[in-house]
Structure formats: C-alpha cells, structure tokens
C-alpha cells in the first residue's frame, strides 16, 4: 500500500478555549502547534487565523505573522490556509493568499446551509449561507493558480465533487488539485461509513483524496479512508478527542493517534518531502 499523507487542522474558527483549552490562537502558538504536528507525522498543516483573543481574523498581517512563525519552526511543511467564511466578500476571504503564497489553500466547492445545532437545547448556536457560486469558484481558482497555490477542494456534499468538472473542462483546475471529503458539518453530508464510501466513488480515478470528519466519528471513518488507500485529516479544528475518549492536549497528540491508526492498517506515513513529490507541490514561500 502507498504511504499515507496526514494533514493537521490546527485551530479552526468555530470553537474556542471554552470548548477545548488547548486550541491555539496566536501566531506563536500556531507555530508551536505546527511543530508538534510535524514531529508526530503531519506533512500538511491547515490554518485559520485568529486574533489574540481567539476571534476569527481575516487581516492579512495576521496571516503574515502566522506564516513567519510556522516557517521559522517548520521550514518545509506544506502550509494550507483557510478561505472559508460566512458574510464576507470573496475578496476579503482570499486577500491573504497573494500576500503569503501558501503551498495550498482550501477551495470550497459549493454553496450550502452551514450551522452549529444543539440537540440538547434544540436550537442553532449560529447559522448562515456559505456562498460559493460558480463565478466565485472561477475567480478563486484563478487567484490560486496565478500564485502557484495548490487548490484543496473541500467538498461538503456529493454535488460539490461534481462541481470540479466544469473547472477542469475549462482548463482552470491544476492537475494536482486535491479532493477533501468533508463530513459531519450541519448542512453537509452526514458522517457515516456508507456516505464516505459513496463519496470516495465519486472522486475521479487517480486523484488524491482525504477524509475530513467533524465529530468523534473521525477515527472510525479515518480507518476506512486508510483501508481504502486514501488519506485523512486530524487536529483540534475537527475533533478534540483521541480514540480513547480523552481530550487531546495538542495537535501533536491528534496526529500521533492518526499515525498509529494508519500503521495498524498497514500504511506507513509519508514524510514532507515524499508528500511534496506525491502531490507535485514545490516550496512556494
């Protein structure tokens, strides 16, 4: 079996330290967490920016500070920045990309209802429309390719996978664009084994894909992804808890658990250099 590529989502935007006290906020904390993730086996770090108080940030200077802190500690790791937000213009969502030129960036492949719902209180904590029209997709992928940024196509439902087809037909989608099968978000496809297998079948043959599972079901579905010759993402953005049920104290612990799981299935973990070769991603900045 080919080596497995581990990604680590370090912080996210929808949670805070009242949910998990170990979520990194500041550029220095993100740099330190990136190092812990890399030491445990991650080749890719996916990062949202935050202000020092933990609120989501889209200020370019914050991304630049994060970039410097991560590169200082992890000179060769593949940096992947978020571009997703509700209520912001597409220009606000991607203005940090030309300034920082990360190796990869999240490329959200379709519009959807998006929210966090509590069954206990029977209400939404927040919700909105995550808007990504085809015009938006065309604009974003052009900015990414102009800046040598590999698009990480985040697909929250089956139709999002198909949305790549016209972009590829127009010659806009780089050959090394990757598929992320995101599951468990309210408004997107539920996180079940059957749904993951269905999503995998929709991905064009020969394409790189990984599972992203937003819940404690992450470990069950990550095992399926690994067994089906795919890859998976872990980290405090997606799931605070280790397979034992204990809350993780760092992203490094999440990655270590993921590496152990992969090796139990017979998959060795790809190094950063091997990941760059497999995905055809040269060091961008």
Predicted regions and their residues:
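Active-site mouth loops of central-metabolism enzymes
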Residues: 10-32, 82-90, 126-131, 152, ...
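Active-site beta->alpha loop and helix N-cap motifs at the rims of alpha/beta catalytic domains
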Residues: 57-58, 63-131
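Structured C-terminal cap/extension of enzyme domains
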Residues: 197-202, 220-285
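Glycine-rich, proline-tolerant flexible connector loops at the mouths of alpha/beta enzymes
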Residues: 18, 43-65, 182-183, 187, ...
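Catalytic alpha/beta core domains of metabolic enzymes, predominantly
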Residues: 104-237
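N-terminal small/glycine-rich loop or linker at the start of catalytic domains
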Residues: 1-22, 111-124
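Alpha-helix-loop-beta-strand connector modules within alpha/beta enzyme cores
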Residues: 8, 56-81, 137-140, 144, ...
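Conserved, mostly hydrophobic/aromatic
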Residues: 30, 37, 48, 105, ...
């Amino acid at each position: 079996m080919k080596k497995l590529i581990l990604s680590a989502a370090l912080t996210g935007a929808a949670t805070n330290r009242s949910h998990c006290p170990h979520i990194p906020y500041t550029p220095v904390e993100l740099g330190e967490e990136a190092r812990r993730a890399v030491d445990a086996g991650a080749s890719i770090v996916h990062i949202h920016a935050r202000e020092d108080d933990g609120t989501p940030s889209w200020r370019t200077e914050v991304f630049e500070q994060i970039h410097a802190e991560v590169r200082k500690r992890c000179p060769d790791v593949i940096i992947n920045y978020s571009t997703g937000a509700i209520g912001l213009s597409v220009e606000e969502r991607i203005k940090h990309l030309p300034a920082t030129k990360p190796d990869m960036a999240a490329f959200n492949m379709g519009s959807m209802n998006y929210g966090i719902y509590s069954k206990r209180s029977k209400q939404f904590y927040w919700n909105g429309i995550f808007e990504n029209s085809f015009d938006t997709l065309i604009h974003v992928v052009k900015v990414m390719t102009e800046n040598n940024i590999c698009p990480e196509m985040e697909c929250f439902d089956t139709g999002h996978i198909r949305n790549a087809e016209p972009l590829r037909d127009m010659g806009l989608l780089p050959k090394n664009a990757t598929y992320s099968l995101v599951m468990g978000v309210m408004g997107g496809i539920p996180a079940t084994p059957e749904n993951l297998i269905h999503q995998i079948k929709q991905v064009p043959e020969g394409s790189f894909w990984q599972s992203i599972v937003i819940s404690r079901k992450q470990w069950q579905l990550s095992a399926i992804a690994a067994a089906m010759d795919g890859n998976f993402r872990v980290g405090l953005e997606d799931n605070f808890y280790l397979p034992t049920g204990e809350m993780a104290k760092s992203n490094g612990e999440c990655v270590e658990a993921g590496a152990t799981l992969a090796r139990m299935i017979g998959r060795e973990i790809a190094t950063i250099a091997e990941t760059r070769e497999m995905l055809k991603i040269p060091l961008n900045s």
